[in-house]
């Protein structure tokens, strides 16, 4: 409120604890969803109620922007830090994860762990438009800088992300030029709550490759027809799989990425202590 009265541009980040565990909700929302019949996929009344409470909280923020008279001059970026846990409690066996039809969830480089909601509203952005242009949370900072008129600053040229302003201003249509083509995800440790296997992935175009570092197993998926990552194409298209593997390895070497080896524990050792790099 003070910033809106100052007439100066400002940045505000509101990080909700929802929808994180422990799953807790208001009595009002919980009673609403406990009365509903359970669906085939979504059955957790507490999770549904917590999600509605989050929605209510976002509504308070939007109403305040209207009240302060700055709603028409404000960009809002709504997103998550990662996919949901596959199930609760984390070690419980499940048929469909909370991210279904995406596979698995938080801690993994599968789509359930890395594909998240990303919604932007503001001046010059067409309401109800939709984009299938892949973006990353690394793009948020350079995009904000561009929207604020600072896209040419030297610092913006030294970070991983790129501005997506042109896509936002063009009803979600367009491509984004990146220094390193594709998206790279790296899990160089064993997490027994998740896969329990160190792995990395690369997404470029329609294809995604996952490499498991404990035995060099390769999984290749065509995300345009297999968003759930159920049909491994590595045996059918071995040259494609090897090409993506080589591209990913070059990227890790270029950036001196942490390399998995026995004994790496991400919770108790710093990167310097690991002392294993590409």
Task: Give each language-model segment a name.
Residues 1, 58-62, 66, 141-145, ...:
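Non-transmembrane alpha-helical segments in soluble domains
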Residues 1-46, 85-87, 91-92:
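Active-site His/acidic residue clusters
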Residues 5-12, 70-76, 204-207:
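Loop/turn elements at helix/coil->beta-strand transitions in domains of secreted/extracellular proteins
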Residues 13-16, 52-90:
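Metal-dependent active-site segment of extracytoplasmic phospho-/sulfohydrolases and closely related
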Residues 13-24, 78-86, 160-162, 186-191, ...:
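Short, solvent-exposed turn/loop segments enriched in Gly/Ser/Thr/Pro and often Arg
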Residues 41, 45-52, 131-138, 158, ...:
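Soluble non-cytosolic domains of exported or imported proteins
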Residues 84-109, 125-127, 133, 138-219, ...:
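C-terminal cap/loop subdomain of S1 sulfatases and analogous C-terminal strand-loop tails that border
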Residues 140, 216-217, 223-278:
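Long, internal low-complexity/basic segments
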């Amino acid at each position: 409120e003070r910033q809106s009265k100052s007439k100066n541009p400002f940045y505000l980040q509101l990080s909700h604890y929802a929808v994180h565990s422990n799953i807790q909700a208001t009595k009002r929302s919980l009673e609403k969803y406990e009365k509903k019949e359970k669906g085939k996929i979504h059955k957790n009344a507490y999770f549904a109620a917590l999600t509605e409470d989050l929605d209510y909280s976002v509504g308070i923020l939007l109403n305040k922007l209207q009240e302060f008279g700055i709603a028409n001059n404000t960009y809002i970026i709504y997103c998550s830090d990662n996919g949901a846990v596959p199930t609760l409690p984390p070690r419980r066996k499940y048929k469909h994860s909370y991210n279904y039809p995406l596979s698995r969830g938080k801690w993994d480089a599968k789509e359930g762990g890395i594909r998240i909601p990303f919604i932007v509203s503001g001046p010059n952005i067409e309401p109800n438009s939709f984009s299938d242009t892949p973006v990353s949370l690394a793009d948020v900072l350079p995009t904000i800088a561009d929207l604020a008129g600072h896209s040419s600053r030297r610092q913006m040229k030294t970070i991983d992300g790129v501005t997506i302003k042109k896509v936002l201003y063009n009803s979600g249509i367009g491509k984004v030029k990146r220094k390193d083509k594709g998206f790279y995800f790296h899990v160089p440790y064993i997490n027994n709550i998740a896969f329990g296997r160190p792995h990395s992935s690369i997404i470029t175009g329609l294809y995604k490759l996952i490499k498991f570092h404990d035995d060099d197993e390769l999984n290749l998926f065509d995300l345009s027809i297999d968003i759930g990552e159920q049909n491994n194409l590595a045996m059918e298209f071995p040259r494609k799989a090897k090409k993506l593997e080589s591209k990913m390895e070059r990227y890790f070497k270029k950036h001196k990425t942490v390399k998995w080896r026995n004994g790496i524990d991400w919770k108790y050792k710093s990167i310097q202590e690991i002392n294993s790099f590409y």
